[in-house]
Amino acid sequence: MTEQNKRHRAGFVNIIGNPNVGKSTLMNALVGEKLSIVTAKAQTTRHRIMGIVNGDDYQIVYSDTPGILKPNYRLQQSMMNFVDTAIGDADIILYVTDTVEKGDKNEEYIAKLKKIQCPVVLVINKIDISTQEQVLKLMKWWKEQLPEAIIFPASAQEKFNLDNIFDAIVGNLPVAPPWYDKDVFTDKNLRFFASEIVREKIFLNYKDEVPYSCEVEIEEFKEGAERYDISAVIYVMRDTQKGILIGKGGQSLKKVGTQARIEMEDFFQKKVFLRLFVKVDPDWRESKKELRRFGYEY
């Protein structure tokens, strides 16, 4: 091992917590790139997404995960498999809560954190919408629950206290060579981000069950000299959902396509020609075969 490798720190920092506490917003802020889609709806994140931050003597491999829930169907079970895997292979757990939720909501996972061998950094997010008294009370409560945890009040949205969180993470990384090349910033490819951008726009533009009944698959992804040609299929579970998604005269789907194309062009730094299609697949959330095709694990 070289002298530089003896000083180099690297490890997996896995982010877990309930839905809607700001895990994805926090990871995007820490990484400095929008890698995880963000909406106000719960269960927006379905996959485990890595964001990699490199320095001369460190590499942090952040991993955003779906919000903790009790699964009602096979898709949600796969989402929770991502969470359980993240707990098992972490060098540091970054547990995110906020000033709104009840601390004892996840007793099962809090019990796991008490037994875990790796460092736990606990972030109380959204302090910008709380009072100092409430934040201090929450910090005291969490310190009683997880005495070994390093606790930070923060606001991912306002980027408050992120420097201190970053310093604590780097200071607790194990000494190790980098896991990835230093010019890599995520483990996902552009096809994945194209599908996630479309799915985000669906979450932002529709309500009720429609966003949760949709999955996006990229059927064509071609890079030309001047633009990307992308064809995406949006799968829904019922014909009525297909009608809602398309909208009168196709206007609703056109809006989603326009918003997605604009964001893709910003993310890919190249022009995008995007085609959207809608198909009905009543069983995609329960079918192991379909879920594997969409990138979910079993």
Identify what each model region corresponds to.
Residues 119, 128-186:
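Canonical P-loop GTPase G-domain recognition
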Residues 22, 161, 252:
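Conserved glycine(s) of the Walker
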Residues 1-81, 85-87:
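Conserved G1/Walker A P-loop phosphate-binding module
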Residues 57, 81-149, 222-225:
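Conserved C-terminal guanine-recognition region of P-loop GTPase G domains, centered on the G4
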Residues 33, 52-56, 86, 90-93, ...:
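Conserved, well-folded catalytic cores of nucleic-acid-processing
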Residues 64, 125, 155:
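Active-site glycine-centered loops adjacent to acidic/histidine catalytic or metal-binding residues
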Residues 190-298:
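P-loop NTP-binding site
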Residues 45, 68-70, 102-103, 130-131, ...:
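Catalytic P-loop NTPase motifs of RecA-like helicase/translocase cores
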